[in-house]
Amino acid sequence: MAAALLARACGPVRGALWPRDCRRLHTIFQSVELPETYQMLRQTCRDFAEKELVPIAAQVDKEHRFPEAQVKKMGELGLMAMDVPEELSGAGLDYLAYTIAMEEISRGCASTGVIMSVNNFLYLGPILKFGSKEQKQQWITPFTSGDKVGCFALSEPGNGSDAGAAATTAQADHDSWVLSGTKAWITNAWEASAAVVFASTDRSLQNKGISAFLVPMPTAGLTLGKKEDKLGIRASSTANLIFEDCRIPKENLLGEPGMGFKIAMKTLDMGRIGIASKALGISQAALDCAVNYAENRRAFGVPLTKLQGIQFKLADMALALESARLLTWRAAMLKDNKKNPFIKEPAMAKLAASEAATAITHQAIQILGGMGYVTEMPAERHYRDARITEIYEGTSEIQRLVIAGHLLKSYRS
């Protein structure tokens, strides 16, 4: 199926070999060496990124152009539905595999990484976890091949991090739901063929009155806002979804009425691993750029890498990157081990990785000097792409609140 190349890289996707390797990796604090199957997956994704993504990354960023051909090739590799079981045409891999793949794709092109992340866990994730058998067949299988992508519509113009304050409403009307309101900052909006949309079915219950819906795109009563002109990740579209008496079938309710906030929070916990992995890829690309430049640029008669000030910067960049990578891998492995509750760990991974990405890309530009400030080198693009990782799928401030809340709870129990 679509995961043929991944299967060749990794051997059996499910079965004796893969779970045994997972158990080995769960002793990560004894050994951080990836098992061979994961190493092969990593190399497969790295080779793909270097061949298909690195050559087009600057141009699609400049043109704000969706990398359609590359996304389709990723679908053929199984990268657009990594956690989806094979019976639904997915790759059937685990979270650690996804984390590794996401880093390598984002290392090649951060915009493509976020397109992959949204489709995998913000769109397919909640349907896989909360959808009925019929919904999974209709709303998952067509979105595994790269021919279609989905989006996730939670944020609104007025609520930002306050996801429970949804102003968008869904009214039951005979055999339909009628949606009205505006969703903001929706990634993949202009290319999406479907959306997971959150709307209030009972305003008096606040976040307990929020429900989740599956909305086809395009559909009557739904219009797209302008494509936002963003600082970074410019090859992925971002726009508002505007609902004006948008009528969808009653069976498009995802889960039960009032479950929407729970679905959203569970989904964001999963998605934060993806954003952490994306941040790692950006960081690695920036570090690669800085080292390569510093090795070849001479000052005072020696390569920049002979200067202690540059060495210190590179050391700090590598330290931040490796620390964040371990937190991200740990979060992925805990998810694979079905840790419950699974809230603090992805928050820690996202916070560490996103702030590391901002710091590392900043220092990469500093090392390159004037060359870091021009588009001839990729350092400035990495810097622009990194900044959003501290904002979407929960700001750094929200992650700190989550971490502190769970920390204090553990001390008080």
From Swiss-Prot:
GO terms for biological process: butyrate catabolic process; fatty acid beta-oxidation using acyl-CoA dehydrogenase. Substrate binds at residues 161, 269-272, 394. One of its GO terms (molecular function) is acyl-CoA dehydrogenase activity. FAD binds at residues 152-161, 185-187, 297, 308, 366-370, 395-397. The modification N6-succinyllysine is found at residues 51, 129, 262, 306. Pfam families: Acyl-CoA_dh_1, Acyl-CoA_dh_M, Acyl-CoA_dh_N. PROSITE patterns: ACYL_COA_DH_1, ACYL_COA_DH_2. The active site is at 393 (proton acceptor). InterPro entries: Acyl-CoA_DH_CS (IPR006089), Acyl-CoA_Oxase/DH_mid-dom (IPR006091), Acyl-CoA_Oxase/DH_mid-dom_sf (IPR046373), AcylCo_DH-like_C (IPR036250), AcylCo_DH/oxidase_C (IPR009075), AcylCoA_DH/ox_N (IPR013786), AcylCoA_DH/ox_N_sf (IPR037069), AcylCoA_DH/oxidase_NM_dom_sf (IPR009100). This is Short-chain specific acyl-CoA dehydrogenase, mitochondrial. It comes from Sus scrofa.
